């Protein structure tokens, strides 16, 4: 496995759960983009970076199992959002850090993930979160698994927003420019089509 020794080993969580409301109820991770399922694009990117690849999913378990070392499912069938997947994965992570990615950002690249890990070396006790311009991207982050209990307590108190759950831990920003194309979120059919056309030019 080609993981630079200077960077902390990490477990990686791919978030593929959810209702897929903007996709007409389809399982977003399995929707094809440029001839491959979205989850396959993220698998190809992250597989060389970890020996603990976790996927959070609520359906099509057999298909997702092909891409993961571990699968996690929400303990609630109501699709309570990405924080549900994060809280389920943190106690199972085999490394001290959990790197989190949604399944609908296929343009994210290895330098971005490596930059997150480098920032984690600088600030080992705090979550690292991508900040695009003035906007936080809480689903592109690294979380020390030591904070699992804090996030669980936030969940039990009724919090469902990953950003608000992480706020008390004073996340450190990995600052990116507004409009960074790597952060394109392909969460509607129109966006999928538009990005595909632009990439083909």
Swiss-Prot record:
Coiled-coil boundaries: none
Biological process annotations from GO: bis(molybdopterin guanine dinucleotide)molybdenum biosynthetic process
Main location: cytoplasm
Cellular component annotations (GO), alphabetically ordered: cytoplasm
Entry cofactors: Mg(2+)
EC number, as in UniProt: 2.7.7.77
Annotated SUPFAM superfamilies: Nucleotide-diphospho-sugar transferases
Keyword Hydrolase: no
Gene Ontology MF terms: GTP binding; metal ion binding; molybdenum cofactor guanylyltransferase activity
Subcellular location: Cytoplasm
Keywords carried by this UniProt record: Cytoplasm, GTP-binding, Magnesium, Metal-binding, Molybdenum cofactor biosynthesis, Nucleotide-binding, Transferase
Keyword Transcription: no
Source taxon at top rank: Bacteria
Record-listed GTP binding positions: 15-17, 28, 74, 104
Residues where Mg(2+) binds: 104
Signal sequence region: none
Catalysed reaction equations from the record: Mo-molybdopterin + GTP + H(+) = Mo-molybdopterin guanine dinucleotide + diphosphate
Ranges that cross the membrane: none
Protein task: Transfers a GMP moiety from GTP to Mo-molybdopterin (Mo-MPT) cofactor (Moco or molybdenum cofactor) to form Mo-molybdopterin guanine dinucleotide (Mo-MGD) cofactor.
Free-text comment about domains: The N-terminal domain determines nucleotide recognition and specific binding, while the C-terminal domain determines the specific binding to the target protein.
Quaternary state and interactors: Monomer.
Family that this chain belongs to: Belongs to the MobA family.
NCBIfam families per the UniProt record, alphabetical: molyb_mobA
Descriptive protein name: Molybdenum cofactor guanylyltransferase
Gene name as annotated: mobA
């Amino acid at each position: 496995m080609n993981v630079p020794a200077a960077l902390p080993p990490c477990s990686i969580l791919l978030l593929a759960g959810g209702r897929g409301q903007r996709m007409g109820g389809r399982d977003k991770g399995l929707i094809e983009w440029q001839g491959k399922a979205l989850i396959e694009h993220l698998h190809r990117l992250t597989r060389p970076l970890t020996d603990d690849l976790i996927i959070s999913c609520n359906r099509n378990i057999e298909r997702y199992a092909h891409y993961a070392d571990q699968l996690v499912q929400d303990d609630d069938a109501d699709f309570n959002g990405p924080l549900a997947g994060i809280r389920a994965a943190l106690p199972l992570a085999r490394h001290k850090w959990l790197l989190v990615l949604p399944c609908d950002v296929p343009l994210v690249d290895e330098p971005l993930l490596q930059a997150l890990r480098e920032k984690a070396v600088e600030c080992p006790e705090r979550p690292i979160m991508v900040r695009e311009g003035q906007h936080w991207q809480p689903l592109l982050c690294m979380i020390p698994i030591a904070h699992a209990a804090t996030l669980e307590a936030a969940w039990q108190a009724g919090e469902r927003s990953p950003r608000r759950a992480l706020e008390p831990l004073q996340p450190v920003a990995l600052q990116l420019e507004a409009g960074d194309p790597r952060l394109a979120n392909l969460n509607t059919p129109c966006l999928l089509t538009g990005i595909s056309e632009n990439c083909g030019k």
